[in-house]
Swiss-Prot record:
The keyword ATP-binding applies. This is UDP-N-acetylmuramate--L-alanine ligase. Keywords: ATP-binding, Cell cycle, Cell division, Cell shape, Cell wall biogenesis/degradation, Cytoplasm, Ligase, Nucleotide-binding, Peptidoglycan synthesis. HAMAP family: MurC.
Length: 491
């Protein structure tokens, strides 16, 4: 660390000046990697470990970080602090070694809280829409010339990174409720997009516990802070009297402080009007499809309006919004082999949504923007517990597509649960008589099993949170065409 870097570091986070070397266990995750990237740009020595390289680790290596693709005790040698992902178990050899060496071990949200401590923090929480809303707020603040720091759970496509160190006073961050670690954050402004039952193992299966945790998060706001909340969500509407802070509501509801009306989707863009108190109506063109994204934009506009950002900057940012990685991510439109003598094309869209509400929103956006397309979904359930807990909801939502192909459940470290597997879910959906799902037992067979169901006027949604994003990219690389054994060997 040179003198100039150290001076910059001290000016931004003076109380951390004794920290030199920060080690991340599970550094390849988007949330972990984003924080590591900001700290690397602040001048800290960064190291980290994960099981395999990915774009996040490559970006960090480009910034000078040392990355180990293993978990060994010696990796934490000389670290001032060890930051651990919630996916890492307590018996990880690096965690054990850190404790034995009396090196502090903290969760990622604690480090994010330290970054936020010396800035004007804007935290975006909620079951769905956090990543996109974080990107929208960041885009608006950047367009307004405020040069924010942001830390997002997904790739901000306009910036090409998950996180960026700005020189302005704002830090805009996605706040993760999955392990309740967002309670470490103390922002000035908090957005809550919605609250549904998810990650219930963290909350002992008690929805009241989850709701109270969100209230506790909002009570971390100072008394002069502001909560921005979607009043369309019934749980948020129920909780509003308990917030105890200044609030701004948004939604399609007539009593929303920032109200969406006259929504219309044309292809990938949403067009709508935002009505705000004591402001002229704002006529928005949003470069993101779906009513759910109009709500995300309304949240971002509510925050920006409160900050006094010019309407023109807001409108420019939303119209040019490039989205986030794996959120209705358009990967291309590819020509197909002639079907019944007629040639055609198929659009390929990759989406991270893995909760029934998210899948439903993606399907509705696809139907609204491309109503004449044959809608084909390749779905990978994520976690056996989620599949079990939301089984009927998944079965109901997935019947809305024209053709469904389903991969095996991505376990995310969980043991199988009888009846919460893809074969059972396919059987249940088939029994409802609307569609006949196709189980894909081997990901290598996806292109081969996809080809016969395409009509030449298709929109393919690749949906899920496991390793299905890699499958989507491989489909784009081969332009949806099944590979011969010779081609596979050549690849």
């Amino acid at each position: 660390m040179n003198t100039q870097q150290l001076a910059k570091l001290r000016s931004i986070v003076p109380e951390m000046r004794r920290v030199r070397h920060i080690h991340f266990v599970g550094i390849g995750g988007a949330g972990m990697g984003g924080i590591a990237e900001v700290l690397a740009n602040e001048g800290y020595q960064i190291s980290g470990s994960d099981l395999a390289p990915n774009p996040v680790t490559q970006q960090l290596m480009n910034l000078g970080a040392t990355i180990y693709f293993n978990h060994r005790p010696e990796n934490v040698r000389d670290a001032s602090v060890v930051v651990v992902s919630s996916a890492i178990s307590a018996d990880n050899p690096e965690i054990v070694a850190a404790h034995e060496a009396r090196i502090p071990v903290i969760r990622r949200a604690e480090m994010l809280a330290e970054l936020m401590r010396f800035r004007h923090g804007i935290a975006i929480a909620g079951t769905h829409g956090k990543t996109t809303t974080t990107a929208m707020v960041s885009s608006i603040y950047a367009e307004a010339g405020l040069d924010p720091t942001f830390v997002n759970g997904g790739l901000v496509k306009a910036a090409g990174v998950h996180a960026r160190l700005g020189h302005g006073r704002y830090l805009i961050a996605e706040a993760d409720e999955s392990d309740a670690s967002f309670l470490h954050l103390q922002p000035m402004v908090a957005i809550v997009t919605n609250i549904e039952a998810d990650h219930m193992d963290t909350y002992q299966g008690d929805f009241e516990n989850l709701k109270q945790t969100f209230i506790n998060f909002l009570h971390n706001l100072p008394f002069y802070g502001r909560a921005v909340m979607c009043v369309d969500d019934p749980v948020i509407r129920e909780l509003l009297p308990r917030v105890g802070r200044q609030t701004t509501t948004y939604g399609f509801s007539e009593d929303a402080d920032v109200r969406v009306e006259d929504y219309q989707q044309i292809g990938p863009q949403g067009h709508f009007t935002l009505l705000r108190q004591d402001k002229e109506p704002m006529h928005v063109t949003l470069n993101a499809p779906g009513r759910h994204n109009a709500l995300n934009a309304a949240a971002a506009v509510a925050v920006a309006t409160e900050e006094g950002i010019d309407d023109e900057a807001i409108l420019r940012a939303l119209e040019s919004f490039q989205g986030t990685g794996r959120r209705f991510d358009f990967l291309g439109e590819f020509p197909l082999e002639p079907v019944n003598g007629k040639s055609g094309t198929a659009m390929l869209v990759d989406d991270y949504g893995h909760h029934p509400t998210e899948v439903d929103a993606t399907i509705k956006a696809a139907r609204a923007g491309w109503p004449d397309k044959n809608l084909v979904m390749l779905f990978q359930p994520h976690r056996f517990t989620r599949t079990r807990d939301l089984y009927d909801d998944f079965a109901n939502v997935l019947t809305q597509v024209d053709t469904l192909l389903m991969l095996e459940v991505y376990p995310a470290g969980e043991a199988p649960i009888p009846g919460a597997d893809s074969r059972s879910l396919c059987r249940t959906i088939r029994g409802r008589g609307k569609i006949d799902p196709i189980l894909v037992p081997d990901p290598a067979q996806v292109a081969e099993m996809l080809a016969p169901v395409l009509t030449g006027n298709d929109l393919i949604l690749v949906q899920g949170a496991g390793n299905i994003g890699k499958i989507a990219r491989s489909l784009a690389e081969i332009k949806l065409k099944p590979q011969t054994p010779e081609e596979e060997q050549h690849d």
